[in-house]
UniProtKB/Swiss-Prot annotation:
Keyword Thylakoid belongs to the record: no
GO CC terms, sorted: cytoplasm; membrane
Name of encoding gene: glmU
Pfam families: Hexapep, NTP_transf_3
Region (N-acetyltransferase): 248-453
Protein name: Bifunctional protein GlmU
GO MF, one example: UDP-N-acetylglucosamine diphosphorylase activity
Transmembrane segments: none
Length: 453
């Protein structure tokens, strides 16, 4: 179904108390307006006209990778005026869908229903019935059909009793919408050009006006302050959690889980409380994710356990691995099958081979570590010389004792042993033992200093 979209995103959002344009505030880690843009792209919108005003530079920087037509509304004179700024770009015979950058949860199904409901010579709008309609434009019907929308400030006492309200979302052909917009005036309580007045214009011409309801009222809730944004965040997360539970993922507490990207899960996955998923994350079968862990743009293979409070970003973890607690895997980190990293271990651009382990207090950066290696507590790969990064290569079956510093570039051959406390600056051959320590001294009869009285 061919259509183009106008997204209204020019509002300042005063009640957000922020220097950032309202629509750039994030929901599930993504700007609200980006949710709307993505929905339009998923539905195959031919053109997306983004009407902006306040914070234009910030908007264009944040959405630099989006294929949108930027339309400036220099003065905020109402929703009708905003849409009219984009009207020169409308094709006469195309459907024009009007959406809002601060209404991020509208679904593809609801939009498709609205597009399908639009009469050939008329207009379709999205309405919702609310128990408390205060503040919304009321839908005025005459013996069934919609004949007008009356804003709260212009409504009579009788009209204020109406519970069916306008969401602002509508669709009409470009030719009709341009004509109706050209006929708007600002003779109302707010002195603005209301988009809603096009409904009365359509009715006056004898055009059909169809009303469609969303699947759920949360889809059309807008954001004017941080309280409303927080409410939508929880509603969105509840929806995401429900989908995962239906797919068989065990969320220990769905109310304490945040998905801020996409998650693919195998079978029998268990996710404990306060876990955050960001970017694109893939989790295999029989995986356990411990409480408080953060996973971003990473892959976790089958039968692996991520213990509590681990942070994994841009990393790959193989099968039957154990990570954490309190482990940080940074971009480029890779654990091969059966590898183990424990508490306060950090890896960056490093590979830990099959069956190898670094269980305590270790930094492995720019390193390639073979199979069956034991990395003792307190080991550091010294990869940075103040100007450039250098690589550490450790072969198979190497034992690195506690509190060693491996000053890169350095290579350790298969089966070598590095004694505890060693500062290694030269390559080590296969099977060698290397120890660098100051001579041990014993002082007999030594007395500790006495405390002053």
């Amino acid at each position: 179904m061919k259509f183009s979209t106008v997204i209204l995103a020019a509002g300042k959002g005063t009640r957000m108390h922020s220097n950032m344009p309202k629509v750039l505030h994030t929901l599930a880690g993504k700007p609200m307006v980006k949710h709307v843009i993505d929905t339009c792209n998923n539905l195959g919108a031919q053109n997306i006209h983004l009407v902006y005003g306040h914070g234009g530079d910030q908007m264009q920087q944040a959405l630099a990778n989006e294929n949108v037509n930027w339309v400036l509304q220099a003065q905020q004179l109402g929703t009708g005026h905003a849409v009219d700024q984009a009207s020169p770009h409308f094709q006469d015979d195309e459907k024009i869908l009007v959406l809002y950058g601060d209404v991020p949860l509208i679904s593809e199904d609801t939009i498709e229903s609205l597009l399908e409901a639009q009469p050939t010579d008329g207009i379709a709008l999205l309405t919702v019935v609310l128990e408390d309609p205060t503040g919304y434009g009321r839908i005025v019907r005459k013996r069934g059909p919609v004949v007008a929308i009356v804003e709260q400030k212009d409504a009579s006492e009788e009209q204020k009793l109406i519970k069916e309200v306008n969401t602002g979302v509508l669709v009409a052909t470009g030719r009709d919408l341009k004509r109706w917009l050209a006929g708007l005036n600002n003779n109302n309580a707010q002195g603005e050009y209301y988009l809603t007045d096009v409904i009365a214009a359509a009715h006056d011409e004898g055009r059909a006006v169809e009303a469609v309801h969303p699947s759920h009222s949360i889809e059309v809730e807008g954001v004017n302050d941080r309280i409303q944004l927080a409410r939508l965040e929880r509603a969105f997360q509840a929806r995401q959690a429900k989908k995962l539970l239906e797919q068989g993922v065990m969320l220990r507490d769905p109310a304490r889980f945040d998905l801020r990207g996409t998650l693919q899960c195998g079978s029998d996955v268990e996710i404990d409380v306060n876990v955050i998923i960001e970017g694109n994350v893939s989790i295999g079968n029989n995986v356990v994710i411990g409480a408080g862990s953060i996973l971003k743009d990473c892959e976790i293979d089958d039968n692996t356990v991520i213990r509590p409070y681990s942070v994994i970003e841009g990393a790959t973890v193989g099968e039957n691995c154990t990570v954490g607690p309190f482990t940080r895997l940074r971009p480029g980190a890779e654990l091969r099958d059966d590898a183990h990293v424990g508490n306060f271990v950090e890896m960056k651009n490093a590979r830990l081979g099959e069956g190898s382990k670094a269980n305590h207090l270790t930094y492995l950066g720019d390193a390639e570590i073979g199979k069956g290696v034991n990395v003792g507590a307190g080991v550091i790969t010294c990869n940075y010389d103040g100007a450039n990064k250098h690589k550490t290569v450790i072969g198979d079956d190497v034992f690195v004792g506690s509190d060693c510093q491996l000053v890169a570039p350095v290579t350790i051959g298969n089966g070598a042993t590095i004694g505890a406390g060693t500062t290694l600056t030269k390559n080590v051959a296969e099977g060698e033992l290397v120890i660098t320590r100051a001579p041990e001294r014993k002082i007999a009869g030594w007395q500790r200093p006495a405390k002053k009285k």
